[in-house]
From Swiss-Prot:
Residues 156-213, 228-259, 291-319 are annotated as: Disordered. It comes from the Eukaryota. Transmembrane segments: none annotated. Residues 156-182, 195-213, 228-240 have a biased composition (Low complexity). This is Uncharacterized protein YBL081W. Residues 183-194, 241-254, 297-311 have a biased composition (Polar residues). It comes from Saccharomyces cerevisiae (strain ATCC 204508 / S288c).
């Protein structure tokens, strides 16, 4: 009836699944191995024996003999299971295996074995030295590949057009040598010097030249070692005149003159006593930290105040303070207009502890 649940016993939950899989796999492998050992013409009951015995037994045409209780008897291998041929080897001639009854079978059996051995070896040799047909492609591509990769065509059996191939190879070798010479001549002038001050006539002449290094906006100057004329120096367009390129090499004297002159020992000693200067300032003005100058750099910059004496350092109220002076870094006129920056000069008479600083009052409240 529909909806009924039927329990099908396949595997118990208590059974080990791994054990079942291992047993199944081992049985499957044994079955495959037995099928591989079984010969094609052997019966099923001989599947567990090595094929060498089956091969030995069935290559002997007709009946064969074995020695048993001093009686010579013939046994048909198809009538019995064939265990005698496996367990009992065929004895040699001194034991009377092949006697006068069937003496003519011995050379026949030997010839059959030799023929089978020769045919088997011949088949193996044919399979080993079998030549597969080559891939048919473009003959030009094939010739190019033969020149590029000759080791791939070392065992080639193609003997057609040998004379033509030899002549083509000679021509190709000549072409290759010419190409190599051209490449060598080109690479001699590959290290060229760039000159940004190129003349228009030279630029226009290089655009029409056959040199592989043609550029429309650049000038390439050849090394001084190239005495022969090149496409760059000998080419011309519209009969325009241009100057010959000059070399970029300089003499050793020019190179020494171009080097910067370093300071000597005497100049270093004199520089220690002189005040330091700034490169972006005029030569007559020095740094602010120098105490030897009295001239002001700008209109709003005054000379720095001297530090108070040790007795005055204890009480800042005795120190002179100029709040309107631009020498104070945090409270100058060029800063933002906050709070006591713009206070009166009369407030400078107040002690430093009672004066407000910036936008803050003495009680750390915002100044308004």
């Amino acid at each position: 009836m529909p909806g009924q649940i039927i329990s099908i016993p396949f595997l118990s939950q208590n059974e080990d699944m791994d054990k079942y899989l291992l047993e199944y796999r081992s049985l499957k492998l044994l079955h495959q191995s037995s099928n591989s050992f079984q010969s094609h013409n052997a019966p099923s009951h001989q599947s567990n024996y090595h094929p060498h015995y089956n091969h030995m037994k069935y290559n002997n045409t007709g009946s064969y003999y074995y020695y048993n209780n001093n009686n010579n008897s013939s046994v048909n291998p198809h009538n019995q299971a064939g265990l005698q041929s496996i367990n009992r080897s065929i004895p040699s001639a001194p034991y009377g295996a092949y006697n006068q009854n069937r003496a003519n079978d011995v050379p026949y059996m030997n010839t059959q074995k030799k023929h089978h051995r020769f045919s088997a070896n011949n088949n193996l040799n044919q399979q080993k030295y079998k030549q597969y047909p080559q891939y048919t492609s473009n003959p030009m591509v094939t010739a190019h590949l033969k020149q590029t990769y000759p080791q791939l065509y070392y065992n080639s059996n193609v003997n057609a057009h040998n004379n033509n191939n030899n002549s083509n190879n000679n021509n190709n070798n000549n072409n290759n040598s010419n190409n190599n010479n051209n490449l060598y001549n080109q690479t001699q002038f590959s290290t060229r010097y760039f000159n940004s001050n190129s003349s228009p006539s030279l630029t226009s002449s290089t655009s029409n030249s056959s040199s592989p290094y043609n550029q429309s906006t650049f000038e390439y100057i050849l090394p001084s070692t190239s005495a022969a004329s090149t496409n760059l120096s000998s080419s011309s367009s519209n009969n325009s005149m241009h100057t010959n390129p000059t070399t970029a090499t300089s003499t050793s004297a020019d190179l020494i003159n171009d080097l910067p002159v370093g300071p000597t020992s005497s100049s270093l000693i004199s520089d220690l006593h002189s005040p330091p200067t700034v490169s972006f300032l005029p030569a007559s003005q020095t740094l602010l930290m120098s105490s030897t100058t009295s001239s002001s750099i700008g209109t709003n910059i005054n000379p720095p105040q001297h530090s108070p004496s040790p007795s005055q350092r204890e009480d800042f109220s005795t120190a002179p303070v100029n709040m309107s002076s631009s020498a104070s870094l945090l409270m100058n006129d060029s800063s933002l207009g906050w709070g006591s920056n713009h206070m009166n000069v009369s407030s400078s008479s107040q002690p430093a502890s009672s004066r407000p600083f910036g936008i803050w009052n003495t009680d750390m409240s915002v100044w308004s």
